[in-house]
């Protein structure tokens, strides 16, 4: 080694020895110890020195920090000379640049196809997937010119269209190193994700293969991410069809796809009663959290710009504070996201700019007021709320009682991979006529052309936590609803589960006592119970039996619910039918009768 190299050897903090060259003055962020999963992934990466590496880690767990440490190691060892970071949105270009600066790394967020020159003081550049697709040859030439590390943030976007996938392969096939990151390593279609390895399973299907995986369940156990409590709201929805006929259906009951679509759309109507009631409940929950976490923030994810503006007006009227409104075609949106992340204001409203990758750790309360229902969109949206800052923090998400969403909420901890050629793949066709995750923000779908929303009342139907359902239905604005909205903001998962069980039991005891003390007979006695009431009682009975099984076997509640699903089939408890719940009740009774 010559003196002109300006390099020296040092022991690697992950094991072994590497050549180093100071990137810049070390910073506070760069000096922090890595989390366990990041350290294990670094050891694996440095030991194998792979050309391609796919890191799958739950949203909020620190994928960016891991990638920046890899970047630092490769630049210091001169394995690469420059870096290209590819991201889904313009805002993430700026976010990556700021994160890199805390590690002593300089990235150029202004790099463009029309002006591809950049200062030699930068270690690399940031660009969007769309930018690459617009001129892949330009990026191929740039990549071939110097030893390049390419980092793909949310790599599943590489399969958004055949043209995108082809462009990414053309631009970066000759890269020295490629590091792919995602929190959701799956898609709702069969488009292969570039530079991701697929392997055959026993059924002959191709599954994506990660080099390192860190699941949401692992993150919960390590305290890296927050537990999520879903507050599920149902209600009687009423609408009028094109012939002038009025119809009604209840969210949360078994409905046809068309009925579900119209009831869902009616509930989300800003001029109805359902959204104001849910916004009021969510704001009450946020105020409760802010007594313990003063800067806790809330976000409404809207279907389109029109609804977003209407929700903003509602919030301003109800809270006397103007919320931050983020629309993708507004040039000031990125600055508003950054400002909201730094300040202590209460509410943010967005269509989809904040649904993926955006880092706002103080977000603690969400309203899922969009008709997007694919697993990918849902997981990315919920991922905005799970980043943990302090022990005991929880996230509270308000969702409509729609079967697809209930199943996704109940299976939040399920680890998914991208499967090619999957039979009976979940449809990407939204029953409301268009997926807001892909349609333009001002586009109206066909559903709105042949039906008119009349209104919908709101009712807290159930609480979903750790795959289990808690509570019994109660009207919005009731004392029982306030009982759940007032749950303390700092509880670990075990404390939250115990509190939900206790509050559910107290709720049932109060109702029973009130009925016994009243001289007026129960209005439902002597009449067949509604489907809604039957499902509620069956869920309550099943949860009680699962609690008994928990004490009998020592197994976690979630494990018992999964075992019942394995034995009996069907969706999670929140979305199960009458017969499926009855079958599980019979099965858990058998489980309780078995020797411990």
Swiss-Prot record:
Domain Helicase C-terminal, chain residue ranges per copy: 285-432
Pfam families: ResIII
GO molecular function: ATP binding; DNA binding; hydrolase activity
Gene Ontology cellular-component terms listed: cytosol
Biased composition (Polar residues): 510-523
Region listing for Disordered, in residue ranges: 420-444, 506-533
Boundaries of every Helicase ATP-binding domain copy: 44-203
Assigned protein family: To M.tuberculosis Rv2917.
PANTHER family, A to Z: HELICASE ATP-BINDING DOMAIN-CONTAINING PROTEIN, TYPE I RESTRICTION ENZYME ECOKI R PROTEIN
Designated name of the protein: Uncharacterized protein ML1624
Source species taxonomy: Bacteria, Bacillati, Actinomycetota, Actinomycetes, Mycobacteriales
């Amino acid at each position: 080694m010559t003196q002109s190299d300006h390099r020296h050897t040092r022991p690697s903090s992950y094991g072994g020895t590497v050549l180093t060259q100071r990137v810049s003055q070390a910073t506070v962020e760069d000096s922090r110890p890595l989390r366990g999963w990041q350290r294990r992934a670094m050891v694996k990466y440095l030991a194998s020195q792979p050309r391609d590496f796919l890191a799958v880690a739950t949203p909020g767990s620190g994928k960016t920090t891991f990638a920046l440490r890899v970047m630092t190691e490769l630049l210091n060892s001169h394995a690469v000379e420059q870096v290209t970071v590819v991201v889904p949105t313009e805002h993430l270009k700026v976010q990556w640049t700021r994160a890199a600066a805390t590690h002593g790394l300089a990235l150029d967020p202004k790099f463009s196809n029309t002006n591809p020159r950049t200062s030699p003081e930068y270690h690399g550049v940031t660009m969007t997937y769309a930018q690459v697709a617009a001129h892949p040859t330009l990026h191929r030439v740039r990549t071939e010119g110097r030893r390049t590390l390419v980092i793909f943030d949310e790599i599943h976007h590489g399969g958004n269209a055949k043209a995108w996938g082809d462009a990414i392969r053309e631009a970066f096939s000759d890269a020295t190193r490629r590091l792919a990151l995602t929190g959701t390593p799956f898609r709702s279609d069969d488009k292969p994700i570039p530079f991701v390895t697929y392997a055959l399973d026993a059924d002959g299907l191709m599954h994506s293969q990660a080099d390192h995986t860190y699941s949401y369940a692992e993150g919960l156990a390590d305290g890296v991410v927050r537990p999520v409590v879903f507050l599920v709201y149902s209600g009687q929805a009423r609408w009028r069809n094109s012939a002038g006929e009025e119809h009604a259906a209840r969210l949360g009951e078994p409905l046809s796809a068309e009925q579900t679509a119209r009831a869902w759309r009616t509930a989300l109507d800003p001029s109805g009663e359902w959204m104001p009631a849910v916004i009021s409940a969510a704001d009450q929950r946020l105020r409760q959290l802010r007594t313990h976490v003063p800067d806790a923030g809330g976000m409404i994810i809207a279907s389109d710009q029109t609804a977003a503006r209407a929700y903003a007006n509602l919030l301003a009227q109800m809270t006397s504070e103007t919320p931050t409104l983020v629309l993708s075609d507004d040039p000031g949106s990125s600055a508003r996201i950054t400002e909201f992340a730094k300040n202590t204001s209460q509410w943010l409203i967005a269509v989809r700019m904040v649904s993926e990758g955006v880092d706002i750790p103080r977000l603690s309360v969400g309203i899922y007021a969009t008709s997007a229902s694919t697993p990918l969109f849902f997981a990315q949206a919920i991922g905005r709320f799970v980043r943990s800052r302090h022990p005991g923090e929880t996230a509270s998400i308000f969702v409509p009682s729609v079967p697809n969403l209930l199943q996704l909420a109940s299976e939040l901890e399920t680890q998914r991979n991208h499967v090619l050629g999957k039979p009976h793949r979940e449809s990407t066709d939204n029953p409301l006529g268009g997926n807001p995750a892909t349609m333009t923000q001002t586009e109206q779908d066909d559903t709105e052309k042949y039906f008119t929303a009349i209104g919908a009342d709101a009712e807290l139907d159930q609480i979903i936590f750790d795959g289990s359902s808690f509570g019994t239905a109660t009207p919005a604005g009731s004392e029982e609803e306030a009982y759940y909205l007032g749950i303390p903001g700092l509880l670990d998962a075990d404390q939250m589960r115990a509190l939900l069980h206790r509050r559910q039991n107290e709720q049932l005891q109060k109702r029973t006592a009130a009925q016994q003390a009243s001289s007026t007979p129960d209005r439902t006695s002597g009449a067949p119970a509604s489907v809604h009431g039957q499902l509620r009682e069956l869920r309550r009975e099943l949860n009680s039996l699962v609690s008994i099984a928990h004490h009998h076997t020592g197994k976690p509640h979630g494990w018992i619910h999964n075992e019942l699903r394995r034995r009996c089939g069907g969706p999670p408890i929140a979305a199960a039918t009458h017969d499926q719940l009855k079958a599980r009740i019979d099965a858990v009774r058998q489980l309780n009768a078995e020797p411990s």
